[in-house]
Amino acid sequence: MTTFEGKKVRTALAASTVAAVAIVAAACGNKSDGLGTSGDTAAGVDIKREAAGDITTNGGARRLDGDQTKAIADSIQKSKAKNVILVIGDGTANQELTLARDYQWGAGGQIPGIDQLPLSGDYTTYALNKDTKKPDYTTDSAASGTAWSTGTKTYNGAVGVDVNGKAQRSILEIAKANGRKTGNVTTTELQDATPAVQVAHVAQRKCYGPVETKEKCGSDSLANGGPGSITEQLLAARADVTLGGGWKTFQQTADAGEYNGKTLEVQAKERGYQIVRSGEELDGIKDANQDKPLLGVFAEGNLPRLWDKATATKEGGKEPAVTCSPNPAFGATPKLQSLTKKAIDLLKNDKGFFLQVESGSVDKANHDADPCGQIGETVQLSDAVSTALEFAKQDKDTLVIVTGDHAHTSQIIETGSVTPGLTRTLNTKDGSTLTVNYGTSLDPGEEQHTGGQVRIAAYGPGAANVVGVTDQTDPFFYITDVLGLDRTKK
């Protein structure tokens, strides 16, 4: 707890300016989240934000128990950090967070980790039209990821290049050039847009390997004098820790360059990568560095979703409510939380590190009109954030940032109703039911992104930079500034 005018108060998930302006906001915590309930002594705040009691009584649904002005001001820390952990929920905006909270933790509950971040705001996510150079109001993951990773707006589909096709350096590349350790973790294929934007520069996001690159990104192909496919550039970028899916692309064969005629798996081995294919093998890794970087690939494509499908249908809202269940296909797949913890353990060092972590299938389940798959991957996101926060609280020199890359289609609507779209009704933690609508397509698998601004929240040194309305390009600048990086260093 923090004392304000003689009263104990909790902090808010919001922010204030350093000088005189306090900006009201809201945050939460969890009594059983492993982060403790005695208060965050590193930041001088108690990140706890659940309903006060019986939500049917006056004041029972309150998440605040006093004036927050001083508590918020006290949560602002120094502006330099040794480490930055950027956690992305792909396709995760406020509707997706609310759906997960309502289902898994209850309407008056809290999302562990995510709702515990003391400072927050929203950022704009628009892309650019490749031809007109004017705003494209609904972004994809390639353009959005390029924005935060390089500080440059671009067209949908572009990975690490501007609207004219010119390569833009990423935070990971700059951090590595400045002597920091680097990591890239995802639940998707490592070649997918969000992980790719930190390590590659191609005209089209589907240029995973040499085969696709020659077909879709001709000038980027090694055979045509370009930098190569996303996977080839990933290997050349040489992050200290790289964990995710996408093994099938590593079976493609290079068609030019030093490794011509060899598979990308063989290339990785010859470049000195430690390759692991299971959680058990990952547990055995003790070090990862530039002499022996770690490449963990745990699925042929995307990692399986934690929870089984419950696809929405035309009449799903009227059908009996569904309770989500574990996905049998997940099996022994490493969870995002364990991948995050392992990456942090391998990256922590005296000089500092930059780590990007993505829960990528919130988006993919949203495209599929699959609320249970979507919520399960938001639970994975929550667990990863809790792990990052636990480290940051102990380290006291780590900035944790959590955001989505774009808004998506899922909506909570009137319970039991149907729409012109696809719906599904779920049983919730509260013992009630809610109905989810997917209204941008009648075909599961074809649901579309939407163009709303997206929440961004943070904890640690420099966290106040997320406050208010910012743009998706802003994180590139304040992350590199907080880390004290020379953006011109090669």
Sequence positions of predicted segments:
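Bacterial N-terminal signal peptides that target proteins for export
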Residues: 3-15
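C-terminal motif of bacterial Sec signal peptides marking the signal peptidase cleavage site
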Residues: 24-27
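Bacterial signal peptide processing site
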Residues: 29-32
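N-terminal low-complexity, Pro/Thr/Ser-rich intrinsically disordered segments
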Residues: 34-80
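A post-motif C-terminal structural segment
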Residues: 53-63, 76-82, 92-97, 102-139, ...
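N-terminal amphipathic, basic-rich helices that act as targeting or association modules
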Residues: 83-91, 176
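His/Cys-centered metal/cofactor-coordination and adjacent catalytic loops
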Residues: 154-165
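Glycine-rich phosphate/pyrophosphate-binding loops
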Residues: 172-173, 177-197
